[in-house]
Amino acid sequence: MRTSANKQDLPSVIMRRGPQPLPLLELPPGVGLRVFEEAWGPAAWEHAVNTAFERSMSFDEVMRAEPAFRPERILFLEQEGSPVAVAAAWQRDKWPPGTGYLHYVAVLPGARGQSLGYWVCLACLHQMRREGNILALLETQDERLPAIKTYFKLGFSPDLTSHESYPARWEKILAQLRW
């Protein structure tokens, strides 16, 4: 891993979730769960992710090109028939066997503040368990405080050991969250 003190050179922070039981997936009224479908999935993923991350990414280059790509791993939440949140229950060879990877969580701005990030992530954690992954991890940026709060609510904990910068960065993140 890189060791430069320059923020752009630092790796994303990592959060891990152990084998503890998952909460039930009981979506709020008016929210539906959909699995990726070829007819609408790529455009819906690009719209949500590009809007949330404020950059342009191609579904084919970022997701479909990965060996982990399977339609059932990309989950959407919808309201009134339109996708408003997405996340992926991914796999990465660099992580130990039995570990799922929570990937590209995005909620459209007009749907924020409804805990949809929580619900789409929980749906992905359930998908990981169906695939035999009892552990989960994710990578995120220090400034994504609302997302980090959601990950804590889902039972994720900070990884303090995988990079020398993590202890100080997590101390700052936790102070910003007032935890």
What are these regions (language model features)?
Residues L25-M57, A175-W179:
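Short amphipathic alpha-helix that is part of the acyltransferase structural core
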Residues T3-N6, F152-T161:
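Conserved acetyl-CoA-binding loop of GNAT-fold acetyltransferases
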Residues L138-I148, H163-E171:
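Conserved beta-strand-loop-alpha-helix junction that forms the acyl-donor binding cleft
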Residues M1-P29:
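Acyl-donor-binding surface of acyltransferase catalytic domains
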Residues R2, Q20-L22, Q91, R169, ...:
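Long, contiguous binding/interaction regions
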Residues M128-T140:
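Conserved GNAT acetyl-CoA-binding A-motif
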Residues N50-V107:
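A conserved beta-strand-loop-helix scaffold within acyl/acetyltransferase catalytic domains
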Residues Y104-V107, G113-R130, K149-K153:
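Conserved acetyl-CoA-binding loop-helix of GNAT-fold acetyltransferases
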